[in-house]
Amino acid sequence: RVINDDCPNLIGNRDLYKKVEWICEDCSNIFRNTGMATLCRKNCFFNEDFLWCVYATERTEEMSQLRQWVGILGAGRE
């Protein structure tokens, strides 16, 4: 079960969420810092820690796709 109150469009988009969240999990594993995943997911992935994790996990070639997915998940966010 996936719960993230920061992402208003999580329902119906769990597959996208899992793809984006995987970057946060990888980042947390790379740096052995469990709090990193939480920081990465903050504000539905719309934060500097998420971008930092994209670079740290060497996923920059996917940046435009990731931005699109984060936009979908966070649509309607205040």
From Swiss-Prot:
Inhibits Y-organs where molting hormone (ecdysteroid) is secreted. A molting cycle is initiated when MIH secretion diminishes or stops. Also has significant hyperglycemic hormone (CHH) activity. It is found in: Secreted. It holds the Pfam family Crust_neurohorm. Its main location: secreted. Disulfide bonds join C7-C44, C24-C40, C27-C53. It comes from the Eukaryota. Signal peptide: none annotated. This is Molt-inhibiting hormone. GO terms for biological process: circadian rhythm; neuropeptide signaling pathway. Keywords: Disulfide bond, Hormone, Neuropeptide, Secreted. GO terms for cellular component: extracellular region. Belongs to the arthropod CHH/MIH/GIH/VIH hormone family. One of its GO terms (molecular function) is neuropeptide hormone activity. InterPro entries: Crust_neurhormone_CS, Crust_neurohorm, Crust_neurohorm_sf, Hyperglycemic, Hyperglycemic2.
